[in-house]
Amino acid sequence: MAAPVSEPTVARQKLLALLGQVQTYVFQIELLRRCDPHIGRGKLPQLKLNALQVRALRRRLRPGLEAQAGAFLTPLSVTLELLLEYAWREGERLLGSLETFATAGDVAAFFTETMGLARPCPYHQRVRLDTYGGTVHMELCFLHDVENFLKQLNYCHLITPSRGATAALERVREFMVGAVGSGLIVPPELSDPSHPCAVCFEELCVTANQGATIARRLADRICNHVTQQAQVRLDANELRRYLPHAAGLSDADRARALSVLDHALARTAGGDGQPHPSPENDSVRKEADALLEAHDVFQATTPGLYAISELRFWLASGDRAGQTTMDAFASNLTALARRELQQETAAVAVELALFGRRAEHFDRAFGSHLAALDMVDALIIGGQATSPDDQIEALIRACYDHHLTTPLLRRLVSPEQCDEEALRRVLARMGAGGAADAPKGGAGPDDDGDRVAVEEGTRGLGAPGGGGEDEDRRRGPGGQGPETWGDIATQAAADVRERRRLYADRLTKRSLASLGRCVREQRGELEKMLRVSVHGEVLPATFAAVANGFAARARFCALTAGAGTVIDNRSAPGVFDAHRFMRASLLRHQVDPALLPSITHRFFELVNGPLFDHSTHSFAQPPNTALYYSVENVGLLPHLKEELARFIMGAGGSGADWAVSEFQRFYCFDGISGITPTQRAAWRYIRELIIATTLFASVYRCGELELRRPDCSRPTSEGRYRYPPGVYLTYDSDCPLVAIVESAPDGCIGPRSVVVYDRDVFSILYSVLQHLAPRLPDGGHDGPP
């Protein structure tokens, strides 16, 4: 018998099923926004029913989602809330637009309203963050802006009050409703994959660096976590395959539509897409063929005619169609455009055959605007019949095509073009009448010129048959070298051609290798830019982690306020004497150097934000690893990282330099402005707290006094929170220190709990000592005089 499924698992499964249904509805909304409004009017009853269901779901789930936001968010709950909000808002807007269209009948006005063409860009959200060091203003425009802001908020969590963080996170959530809540597909204007995310950084930290710095590797990183690529496969015969099975059509209509579709596909299928010879080359070949046809064996063969025959031989035997590098990487953008035209023609033909009208979808209603876009925008928008991978291949082939259009590379990659040029030059000389009447074997004035033209056109650039015959011709009788000035000139010209060929061959190899390396490096960016992107789980997970950290602080203060016994030292009389006594007792001692590594890790644990929690994983890492991820992801300057790393070691617990706070002014930032100075002041306060508690444990021998964070506790399956005894740093300047000296056996705060509030390190330690004194072996030390 299978084990029963736990209640949280069942709830998660239900939320996943609900999430899938809401995503389907959002996808329908996105389709109807771009579809002919006449079709949308026919779907009004179903659309209204879905809108009513979304209203009911939102009304029923919203209280629970809001309660969970104050308790513990999950990426699933965040995504579901964003989708519900977007589905409710955009579904109502679509219904209103369809009803307006039913009255006005203006297709352009319908698309202007549904697509937001008359409204400002919705992806600009101003965010204000109030910190102890001042107010920070930012603007969110991309998905990576959201991730960067959340990482920055995570780093500055110790100087940010929970109220200010909650207000800023609410503005971030509003941006994510339109950005992430719009379904699976990411709008191209929202994605900027050149900015690496925290997952990119973590992946690079665990892979071989090949001697490169992390900054250099991040600069070349294409993020595929905030948005992920989706493989899109398009079937060219999809309409032909599924039309026979379309529901709601009569057999006669279906047969007529299939007949029209076949006729339209046959008419638009013309053209093979292969390159055709230019008219100029065609006329040259015709002229050469006419001269050769007029010659027979009874006539003397002139050197020019022999050169024409040899060039025609190389042209006939050198057909490299579909084999050369040029053909392998030729641009195929026209073929993609032809495919789009064929798809559009077939769709319109079927629409006319079935419905008697051409549907006015968004791309057709605004076709003139889309046609005015440049090539880059058109590629980003894409098409209905071409997949992004087809566009990428066409772009890469276009790059090679453009690179190979230089005269040198064109002659090397396409030797037949050299033969065409040589044939044209020979015909030009013969047209001048210089060599047409000279007998074969004679020493006419164009003999050397024709031979050189043939060699340049065939063997000069590496065609078969070159090399050996040339070498023999250069030498005189007996192979002893040239004997006349003509032989010297011929040999010099041949040497120049050979050096030119070798240099061009080497240049071509380097050029093509460099181009190939560039294409390989840029292909990832092209794929990320042009392929369809879907939302990843990074943003919901990051938002949930940061929001949970600040919600835990507010929840901790609310729960401790309801404890059975609450001692508030912030306004109690006689606290100053306790402060002075404990301060004097601790300043006489210094921290054991052997404890410095452990208290340094404690410092890192308290400074680190709630986002990077590697120290709590199943395979836990030390706190310095999580802090490393935190500071590196915000680009902290090297001198600040060095200062942070040596903050505890620099003090060492000796002298009184570590005690920086005045009485009842612990975690007070009055008179301090700026993020970095405020951060440094918070580091000093945290160092003071750590050293004071360490000395307190060693002086009074009461065991280790635990320093904890409010977000150390997670809810149980019953929704309860356990807070073990210890001193908690709340990061709240009004009440920065809370000591739980007694709690219920299960660790929950209740009537038996004893809680101490304070704004002073030494007075709260004295209160802890008072509660620990009856349990100490020697009964504790004397109190303040």
Curated annotation (Swiss-Prot):
It holds the Pfam family PRTP. It comes from the Viruses. It is found in: Host nucleus. ATP binds at F696, A697, S698, V699, Y700, R701, C702, G703. Residues 433-489 are annotated as: Disordered. GO terms for biological process: viral DNA genome packaging. Its main location: host cell. Keywords: ATP-binding, Host nucleus, Late protein, Metal-binding, Nucleotide-binding, Viral genome packaging, Viral release from host cell, Zinc, Zinc-finger. A zinc finger (C3H1-type) spans 197-225. One of its GO terms (molecular function) is zinc ion binding. GO terms for cellular component: host cell nucleus. The keyword Metal-binding applies. InterPro entries: UL28/UL56. Belongs to the herpesviridae TRM1 protein family. Component of the molecular motor that translocates viral genomic DNA in empty capsid during DNA packaging. Forms a tripartite terminase complex together with TRM2 and TRM3 in the host cytoplasm. Once the complex reaches the host nucleus, it interacts with the capsid portal vertex. This portal forms a ring in which genomic DNA is translocated into the capsid. TRM1 carries an endonuclease activity that plays an important role for the cleavage of concatemeric viral DNA into unit length genomes. Associates with TRM2 and TRM3 to form the tripartite terminase complex. Interacts with portal protein. This is Tripartite terminase subunit 1.
